Amino acid sequence: MMSLTFMAGLIFPVFMMLKGINPMSLLLALLTLSLCAVLWLGSFMSSWYAYILFIVYIGGILVLFIYVCMISSNYIASQHMYKSLLYAWGAVMLMSLTMETDTFIILGSNMMYTSVNIPMTILIFLSIYLLIVFFAVVNLMVNMTSILMVESSQV
């Protein structure tokens, strides 16, 4: 159950990034994402690895905060976070269904009943998570009012 909570904490900021145009909301989503990822990783691996990763995340967040303060400080915050909450709730429900299921493995003519292997479940979750983050970044790049917009004259 604790793993499910950390996974929900990883997915919610990604959906916040999909709706967030304000750089400060993106900064908050990135901070939440990094904190949940480090807590989740610290529960599976060595806590020293999680500490080092958190320090790297905080360094990146500080660079982003300096960028926000100097370049784009006059954005208005978005009020459409209810859809993000709905998406995050749906993702948590989907994960809770897939985490507790068992699978059938067919070996030759015998059908053997085994439980889902935990590392495979983590690998599937991380690949889905990477896909969602990819869609969030693409959505930010396509949005015309986004910070990450690349102008054709600069390329």
Curated annotation (Swiss-Prot):
Enzyme class: translocase
E.C. no: 7.1.1.2
Major site of localization recorded for this protein: mitochondrion
Catalytic activity as recorded in UniProt: a ubiquinone + NADH + 5 H(+)(in) = a ubiquinol + NAD(+) + 4 H(+)(out)
Keyword NAD among record annotations: yes
Membrane-crossing residue ranges in chain numbering: 24-44, 51-71, 88-108, 118-138
Compartment(s) of residence: Mitochondrion membrane
A GO term, aspect molecular function: NADH dehydrogenase (ubiquinone) activity
Highest taxon of source: Eukaryota
Gene Ontology annotations for the cellular component aspect, listed alphabetically: mitochondrial membrane
Alphabetical UniProt keywords: Electron transport, Membrane, Mitochondrion, NAD, Respiratory chain, Translocase, Transmembrane, Transmembrane helix, Transport, Ubiquinone
Function: Core subunit of the mitochondrial membrane respiratory chain NADH dehydrogenase (Complex I) that is believed to belong to the minimal assembly required for catalysis. Complex I functions in the transfer of electrons from NADH to the respiratory chain. The immediate electron acceptor for the enzyme is believed to be ubiquinone.
Name of the protein in its database record: NADH-ubiquinone oxidoreductase chain 6
